Amino acid sequence: MDINEKAPGPSGRRPARRRDGGGQVLVLYLAIAVVVAVLAWPWLAPRLGSFPGSLLSWIGDGGSVGAPRPATLDERMDMVEAALAPLAMRIAEADRRLAMLEANPRTAGEDPRKEAAGVSADPEQMSWMAAEIATLKGDLEIVRKLAADEGGATKLSGAVEKAEAAFRRIAERRDRAPLFLAALGQLREAVDRGSPYPAQMKAAMILAEKGTADKLAPLVMGSATGIVTRVGLAESFRVTAAAARKLDVPADSGWVPPNIRRWLGGAVLIRRTEGGEEGLDGILNSTSRLLAGGDLAGAAALLRRAEGPSLAAIQPWLEAAELRLSADAALSELSAMAMTVASSRDE
């Protein structure tokens, strides 16, 4: 036995042939080529106009990912023109047939032998022809009116754009309503606490609509310093009432101190037929009772009847009360409007 020959294995089988990695590399190249083709399809599609439409549509459907994009304005105009193509063909046919009908009488007049032969047209066919001509004339008149307007396509495009803008505004308004309602909630919390609210006010102004931003004007005045709460107004009214009574003391009141004079006046009970108290003391006492019951609007309305020197002490408190009432009314109205818009999102 030659020394170069290899001895067979103990089982008598040949050793297995070694496989190279050529097949795996080929599969990898094919996968990379497919991925590159899919990614480059948007760039290649306009440059492959000579390919058949079915092949391009099959490739486009296979390479597109996600939902189809909405048609643009140019595409919609192309669809409108395609829909008007049959009408244009009918108009051309109508013009041809009208020309033939106009030529027939002239031909008949030029050839009197046909009239002598007694050739007459079918009445049913003539009536059908007249109805068809009337229909075609109506269609032709409509198209001619549209064609006479040089800016018809521009007007149509502008109308479509206006409609799309209106739909976008409605959708944006519905989407911003919950955010505006949340901003109003934070603004109301700050106003109820009596603390400054510049950040909350800025957020509300950004999210508010054009017509709604004007309703936030009562809240702008107190954004830097805050608005006095209802409890604070009720507590500060005691000081205001005392200052108003001091200013209301007449010059010829004599030597009797004001507190003793008020005590003497309260010791005498006078039943009045109208059921109301008179003078500054009556107004201040009624205002105190209304504030104790939580009726700030009624207290402010009653206090506006005060006159005389005491008005200088009452006016600052009255302005603070009116600002509080205006702020509460504006927040309530804006919250109701925002909730109405937000509730219509699913309609």
From Swiss-Prot:
<dbReference type="GO" id="GO:0110146">
    <property type="term" value="C:magnetosome membrane"/>
</dbReference>
<feature type="transmembrane region" description="Helical">
    <location>
        <begin position="25"/>
        <end position="45"/>
    </location>
</feature>
<keyword id="KW-1281">Magnetosome</keyword>
<keyword id="KW-0812">Transmembrane</keyword>
<keyword id="KW-1133">Transmembrane helix</keyword>
<comment type="function">
    <text>The 4 genes of this operon collectively influence magnetosome size and number.</text>
</comment>
<keyword id="KW-0091">Biomineralization</keyword>
<protein>
    <recommendedName>
        <fullName>Probable magnetosome protein Mms36</fullName>
    </recommendedName>
</protein>
<keyword id="KW-0472">Membrane</keyword>
